[in-house]
């Protein structure tokens, strides 16, 4: 194990929203009648905030770039300072270690589902491999995300859940209870039940939340030479006392995990199959 003393902070993410001139005009009109940008505009005039770059407008604290070719959408990128801080640490660790693994915890998503890694995470993970890391292991969201083999090194964008017992927490903060209109002294189990009641698809009803993999991989000369995945399920349909902890998945569930993993890994060109108790790369 190798640890490096570094400034402890979250990685800053830069979101980029691109809209047409017409939509920019619409936002400008809304900002004018609502005053949503009032304080920011005043601070910008007084020099407390940097001027907006040409072709960029602000709305409600978000920056929008006006498209020149009519394309619209969202993208994101990691703060270059944070990337440099991380890759410098990787290179330093490589001086005394045989292999460096990077762990990333992220709840950000690309658009409107939990299956796709955000743009910034892909850029950051590949930068870590470029700097000498042998694998990047992601966690955060409750569902498996795709697995990429980048320069013969695995990037697990998110491994999902392994132990999922948040239904059984004993205490929740006051703001959680207030958010759901409950007394701050309400039992945690009641607070969680209230969240479930008002959800259109509760986490506890989604099979993918209860399915994951346990990776096994071998590294030689900084590269992955062998990779296999143990399919696991967390007992979605079991009784409470046996629920939310990992079990080796049966063959039917394991095949579903392999199919799901192939679908969410499609953008990375990796296909998976279930074979002899393990999920492996499709030959």
Q: Which functions belong to the PLM regions below?
A:
Residues 117-213:
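Conserved beta-sheet core of the metallophosphoesterase superfamily
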């Amino acid at each position: 194990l190798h640890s490096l003393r570094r400034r402890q902070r979250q990685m800053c993410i830069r979101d980029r929203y691109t809209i047409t001139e017409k939509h920019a005009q619409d936002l400008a009109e809304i900002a004018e009648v609502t005053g949503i940008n009032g304080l920011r505009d005043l601070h910008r005039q007084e020099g407390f905030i940097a001027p907006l770059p040409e072709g960029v407008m602000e709305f409600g604290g978000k920056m929008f770039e006006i498209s020149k070719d009519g394309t619209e959408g969202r993208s994101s990128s990691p703060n270059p300072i944070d990337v440099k801080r991380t890759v410098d640490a990787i290179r330093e660790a490589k001086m005394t270690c045989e292999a460096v693994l990077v762990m990333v915890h992220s709840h950000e998503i690309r658009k409107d589902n939990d299956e796709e890694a955000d743009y910034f995470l892909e850029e950051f993970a590949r930068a870590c491999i470029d700097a000498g890391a042998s694998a990047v292991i992601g966690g955060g969201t409750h569902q498996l995300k795709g697995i990429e083999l980048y320069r013969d090194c695995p990037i697990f964008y998110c491994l999902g859940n392994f132990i999922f017992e948040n239904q059984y927490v004993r205490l929740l903060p006051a703001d959680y209870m207030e958010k759901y209109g409950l007394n701050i002294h309400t039992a945690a189990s009641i607070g969680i039940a209230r969240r479930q009641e008002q959800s259109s698809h509760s986490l506890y009803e989604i099979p993918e939340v209860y399915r994951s993999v346990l990776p096994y991989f071998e590294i030689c000369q900084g590269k992955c030479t062998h990779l296999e995945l143990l399919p696991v399920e967390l007992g979605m349909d079991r009784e409470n006392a046996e629920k939310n902890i990992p079990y080796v998945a049966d063959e039917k569930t394991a095949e579903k995990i392999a199919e799901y993993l192939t679908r969410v890994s499609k953008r990375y060109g990796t296909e998976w199959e279930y074979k002899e108790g393990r999920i492996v790369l499709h030959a």
